Amino acid sequence: SVTPKLAFHLLSVVKFEDYLRLQQSLVADLAAGGDCIKVLICEHTMELTVGRKGSHAHIRIPQTEREKQNLQTHWLPRGGGAILHSPGQLAVYPLVPLQWYGWSPGRVLTMVRDAVSMALSQVGIATLCYDGLHSVWGRTGMLAATGISVQQNVSCFGSYINVSPAMGLFGYVDTAWQLPADQSRRTMSSLMAEN
């Protein structure tokens, strides 16, 4: 077993299209033989992303409101559904050269979810994780959504942790496309609401 090498990069608020260009460049570097897991941490401007499990039906923000907010929508080849991004939500992107470490995409997905859950417990937030699901739930609802993809044998994308975003539009985006048995509603929440 190889001991992972990690490099953390703290970015600021980044437009999603700018992040995608950066991710593409880093994936190419890692695919060319890199052995270091690069973890990018940032916030995004208010934008929507939709993964492979998402659809137009998961976005119920009226078109007039989307235009008023200048809300861009990006259809992505990552797992998961629709996610609303905004400042106050922490995006954590572990770019892992899978072949170097011998990890499967499923293992990385579970590791990311578990790392988020452990980090939140370290700051006093009780979390719930469910077998077969990769979101992190708290007392008040879903706290973090996770979705990855693999490009050139490197994991991309990651987890989105709601720390203190303005929650107004979150109710119009169905991020929780699959609900755990003991969660009765598709509620996105935040770490601030947990306190």
Which role does the model predict for each range below?
Residues Q23, I41, G158, M188-L191:
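A residue-level signal for conserved active-site and pocket-lining positions in enzyme catalytic cores
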Residues A57-E65, L71-Q72, L143-V173:
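Short, conserved beta-strand/beta-arch hydrophobic-aromatic motifs that form part
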Residues L109-R113, V163, S184:
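A structural signal for well-ordered alpha-helical scaffolds and beta->alpha junctions
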Residues G168-N195:
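A hydrophobic, small-residue-rich beta->alpha segment in the mid-to-C-terminal subdomain
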Residues S1-G138, M142-L143:
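N-terminal lobe of the biotin/lipoate ligase/transferase fold
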